[in-house]
Curated annotation (Swiss-Prot):
One of its GO terms (biological process) is glucose metabolic process. InterPro entries: GlycerAld/Erythrose_P_DH (IPR020831), GlycerAld_3-P_DH_AS (IPR020830), GlycerAld_3-P_DH_cat (IPR020829), GlycerAld_3-P_DH_NAD(P)-bd (IPR020828), Glyceraldehyde-3-P_DH_1 (IPR006424), NAD(P)-bd_dom_sf (IPR036291). PANTHER family: GLYCERALDEHYDE 3-PHOSPHATE DEHYDROGENASE, GLYCERALDEHYDE-3-PHOSPHATE DEHYDROGENASE 1-RELATED. NAD(+) binds at residues 13-14, 35, 85, 322. Pathway: Carbohydrate degradation; glycolysis; pyruvate from D-glyceraldehyde 3-phosphate: step 1/5. PROSITE patterns: GAPDH (PS00071). One of its GO terms (cellular component) is cytosol. This is Glyceraldehyde-3-phosphate dehydrogenase 4. It comes from the Eukaryota. The gene is gpd-4. SUPFAM superfamilies: Glyceraldehyde-3-phosphate dehydrogenase-like, C-terminal domain, NAD(P)-binding Rossmann-fold domains.
Length: 341
């Protein structure tokens, strides 16, 4: 079977890393990129050099309005570059880009993202939470994808992708009565380098490199959309911290069935080695955040950081590269829906 042809709208952090993940995984073919704010020579530069993930271990050049991305042992990608501000005006069909990754952060509703369908795309995957598009988390609920009705879908958030696999394993084995999540989250592009105005969210406007910033996140509540039996049982918040990448979920839950920490470790390890292999990982090492830069998993369970007050009340800790792990799941989700017709 031929590989799915993919277009990327928005060549920012996630757009570029989706392309890196696509090259590395070699399961989809990227045929187009649209970004109205970046010239093609600048795209080459931004893709080649990355302060967080390092220099691209291959070659990237351009020929006319095509990006050429190559890496030894992997398929090469000849990528048509568009520069349209209007998603409806991008000629995805001209390069047979059936699947479009919407990674601008702007067109996150079904109505806005469906503009890509006018240009010839068949499916749109929003690389962010969506207010109304169905959300799929690979390894958790991706098999509920409905090819005949789901033309615009969301890959949820990086934090939901970390939390949901862990919550599913714990809920399936022990039952979750209720829980609170905190994500200690790396900085992202929406934050300020120094103090500045930030609409109604005043704290978000404080200097990202100087502060631990409490922030809201819908990631825990979104798990209830992905795992319906947990709807209304989880909520959470975030602390933005001055690190460039890698975040960590702290999930504190009350369990229906009592469980020792060893019981919990066993079921998480079984899932990581079995049905969630490649999505959920498991470590007993004395790790810190930089150990997970460029880690392709959604969630890496840290046994040494977990604690238990009693067999029904536990705190569980799981790491994630909020950029690269998430981008890998975007590619996996496309690979899956491409097989569903």
């Amino acid at each position: 079977m031929s590989k799915a042809n993919v277009g990327i709208n928005g060549f920012g952090r996630i757009g570029r890393l989706v392309l890196r993940a696509a090259v590395e995984k070699d399961t989809v073919q990227v045929v187009a990129v649209n970004d109205p704010f970046i010239t093609i020579d600048y795209m080459v530069y931004l893709f080649k050099y990355d302060s967080t993930h390092g220099q691209f271990k291959g070659t990237v050049t351009y020929d006319g309005d095509f990006l050429i991305v190559q890496k030894d042992g992997k398929s090469s990608h000849k990528i048509k570059v568009f520069n349209s501000k209007d998603p409806a005006a991008i000629a995805w069909g001209s390069v047979k880009a059936d699947f479009v990754v919407e990674s601008t952060g702007v067109f996150t509703t079904k109505e806005k993202a469906s503009a890509h369908l006018q240009g010839g795309a068949k499916k749109v995957i929003i690389s962010a939470p969506s207010a109304d598009a169905p959300m799929y988390v690979v390894g958790v609920n991706h098999e509920k994808y409905d090819a005949s009705n789901d033309h615009v879908i969301s890959n949820a958030s990086c934090t939901t992708n970390c939390l949901a696999p862990l919550a599913k394993v714990i809920n399936d084995n022990f039952g979750i009565i209720e829980g609170l999540m905190t994500t200690v989250h790396a900085v992202t592009a929406t934050q300020k380098t120094v103090d500045g105005p930030s609409g109604k969210l005043w704290r978000d406007g404080r200097g990202a490199g100087q502060n631990i910033i409490p922030a809201s996140t819908g990631a825990a509540k979104a798990v209830g959309k992905v795992i319906p039996e947990l709807n209304g049982k989880l909520t959470g918040m975030a602390f933005r911290v001055p690190t460039p990448d890698v975040s960590v979920v702290d999930l504190t839950v009350r369990l229906e069935k009592p469980a020792s920490m060893d019981d919990i470790k066993k079921v998480v390890k079984a899932a990581a080695d079995g049905p969630m292999k490649g999505i959920l990982a498991y470590t007993e090492d004395q790790v810190v955040s930089t150990d997970f830069v460029s880690d392709p998993h959604s969630s890496i369970f840290d046994t040494g950081a977990c604690i238990s007050l009693n067999p029904n009340f536990v705190k569980l800790v799981s790491w994630y590269d909020n950029e690269y792990g998430y981008s890998n799941r975007v590619v996996d989700l496309i690979g899956y829906i491409a097989t569903r017709g």
